[in-house]
């Protein structure tokens, strides 16, 4: 939270809840960082919160319609395409380890099964592309929460007890 880039984004964001800190921690990484301007605008009411599919709102409302965490990919793959918990975890692992061959096998399954549930294949292709763009650097929420909590505590100490903090 101390880099100039993160400080700029945090000022723009004007966080009001701890969940904002958690999300920013997860987003400030290669790949997901491109979603920060939209995340900030949506949080501040400067851009409408939109979902590629209405069915995604359940899992993306807390992050203003943007997929931020690995868990969201897992839950959405289950909801949209009927992936089993095992398939969803395999998807998470493949994205996290950048296993392109595994992802290339899973994509048609995702698109086909989600299409069978009535979702537009073109929108599904966009969703998958978005997931691929962010997922190789995505945090799980618990990881992001721990780092955000440490940053929050550090900022508090720095602001209220600067001499003790620096000692």
Predicted regions and their residues:
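Noncatalytic, beta-rich nucleic-acid-contacting surfaces in large DNA/RNA-processing enzymes
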Residues: 1-167
């Amino acid at each position: 939270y101390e880099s100039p880039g993160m400080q700029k984004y945090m000022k723009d964001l004007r966080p009001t809840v701890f969940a904002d800190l958690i999300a920013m921690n997860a987003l400030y990484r290669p790949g997901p960082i491109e979603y920060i301007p939209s995340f900030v605008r949506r949080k501040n009411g400067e851009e409408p919160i939109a979902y590629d599919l209405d069915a995604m709102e359940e899992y993306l409302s807390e992050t203003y319609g943007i997929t931020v965490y690995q868990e969201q990919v897992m839950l959405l793959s289950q909801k949209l395409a009927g992936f089993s918990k095992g398939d969803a975890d395999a998807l998470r692992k493949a994205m996290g380890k950048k296993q392109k061959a595994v992802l290339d096998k899973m994509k048609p399954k995702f698109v086909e099964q989600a299409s069978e549930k009535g979702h537009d294949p073109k929108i599904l292709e966009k969703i998958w592309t978005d997931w691929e763009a962010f997922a190789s650097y995505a945090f799980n929420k618990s990881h992001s929460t721990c780092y955000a909590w440490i940053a929050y505590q550090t900022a508090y100490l720095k602001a209220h007890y600067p001499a003790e903090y620096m000692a």
